[in-house]
């Protein structure tokens, strides 16, 4: 709420977000805005790298924004369309009634690299690392969506069924969320992420499975 007030934006504004890493942080910001009822948003494909690569103008001036004098009404009634919490997710995992996208590294997915008390992944999750969707030879722009969709389907994802994306801290899954939206997928993010799931001793986990 404080950020929205400071930026002086309302749901009527078209918010364009970008970063310097291909879209993860920018995607996370857009996800937050969607949860708050701000859906008139765009991601700048490739971020600042693509902007500079196209020789577009830049400025070193720091923009000053006058905060609004009144609170913009934040809409939270649709938050459940974009976010899922631990208890709901765990119930669906135990019922094997959910499609999960783990967008961390393969080492994190298999449990070889620990970033929490426990390593591995949520049972049933399929692995597709977030950065795989980025073209490093083209200023970190997204690969063509049909290519990414084909790869996801090859891994067993069903884009006609809802999916939940997660990473370590809901940073990298910010881009996964945006990708899902661009593909017309019914996608939510588990913002508790592995930092919550993997640090709880009662969470079911799977380890040692190498993604195909």
Regions found by a protein language model. Give the residues of each.
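Short cysteine clusters
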Residues: 167
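Cysteine-dependent PTP/DSP-like catalytic domain, specifically the C-terminal lobe
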Residues: 186-212
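Thiolate-centered catalytic microenvironments shared by cysteine-dependent enzyme domains
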Residues: 1-87, 92, 113, 172-188, ...
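Short active-site oxyanion
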Residues: 39-40, 97-98, 161-163
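Conserved beta-strand segments of alpha/beta enzyme cores
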Residues: 40-42, 99, 124-126, 186-188, ...
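Positively charged, proline/Ser/Thr-rich regional signature most characteristic
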Residues: 1-10, 88-155, 159, 199, ...
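Short, surface-exposed amphipathic charged segments that create phosphate/polyanion-binding patches used
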Residues: 56-60, 142, 204-206
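Conserved beta-strand elements of the Class I
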Residues: 16, 99-101, 164
């Amino acid at each position: 709420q404080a950020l929205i007030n400071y930026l002086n934006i309302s749901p009527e504004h078209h918010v364009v977000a970008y970063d310097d890493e291909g879209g993860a942080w920018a995607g996370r910001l857009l996800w937050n805005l969607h949860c708050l009822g701000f859906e008139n948003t765009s991601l700048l494909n490739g971020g600042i790298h693509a902007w500079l690569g196209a020789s577009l103008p830049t400025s070193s001036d720091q923009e000053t924004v006058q905060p609004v004098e009144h609170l913009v009404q934040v809409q939270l009634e649709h938050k459940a369309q974009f976010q899922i919490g631990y208890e709901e997710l765990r119930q669906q995992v135990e019922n094997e009634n959910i499609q999960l996208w783990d967008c961390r590294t393969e080492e994190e997915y298999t449990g070889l690299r620990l970033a929490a008390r426990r390593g591995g992944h949520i049972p049933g999750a399929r692995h597709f690392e977030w950065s795989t969707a980025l073209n490093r030879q083209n200023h970190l722009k997204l690969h063509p969506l049909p290519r990414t969709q084909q790869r996801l389907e090859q891994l067993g994802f069903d884009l006609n069924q809802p999916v939940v994306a997660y990473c370590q801290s809901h940073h990298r899954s910010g881009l996964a969320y945006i990708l899902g939206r661009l593909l017309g997928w019914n996608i939510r993010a588990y913002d508790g992420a592995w930092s919550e799931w993997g640090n709880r001793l009662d969470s079911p986990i799977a380890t040692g499975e190498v993604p195909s």
